[in-house]
């Protein structure tokens, strides 16, 4: 299963690439599909490509939901006696 996730643009390298913060890690991503990006913008990232701009509030809501999903999965594994 593949997910598209919100990431924050930390640095613009050129017209086709940028550095984004993904779960605390910095990674170079392809931004060729989008125009007028600025440092601090949030984008939806899928398999290394920025697909769409996203406002910060929606990005934060989505990231919070993904974090909650991770916590629920860990709790379910613990309840079943599995290691996370």
Swiss-Prot record:
Annotated pathway: Protein modification; [NiFe] hydrogenase maturation
Q: Name one GO molecular function term.
A: iron ion binding
Query: Could you give a single Gene Ontology term from the biological process aspect?
Result: protein maturation
InterPro entries, alphabetized: Hydgase_assmbl_chp_CS (IPR019812), Hydrogenase_HupF/HypC (IPR001109)
Domain of life, per lineage: Bacteria
Against SUPFAM superfamilies, the record matches this protein to: HupF/HypC-like
- PROSITE patterns assigned to the protein according to its UniProt record, in alphabetical order: HUPF_HYPC
Q: Which PANTHER family match?
A: HYDROGENASE MATURATION FACTOR HYBG (PTHR35177:SF2)
UniProt function note: Involved in the maturation of [NiFe] hydrogenases. Involved in the biosynthesis of the Fe(CN)(2)CO cofactor.
Q: Which family does it belong to?
A: Belongs to the HupF/HypC family.
Name by which UniProt lists this protein: Hydrogenase maturation factor HypC
Which organism is the protein's source? Answer: Azotobacter vinelandii
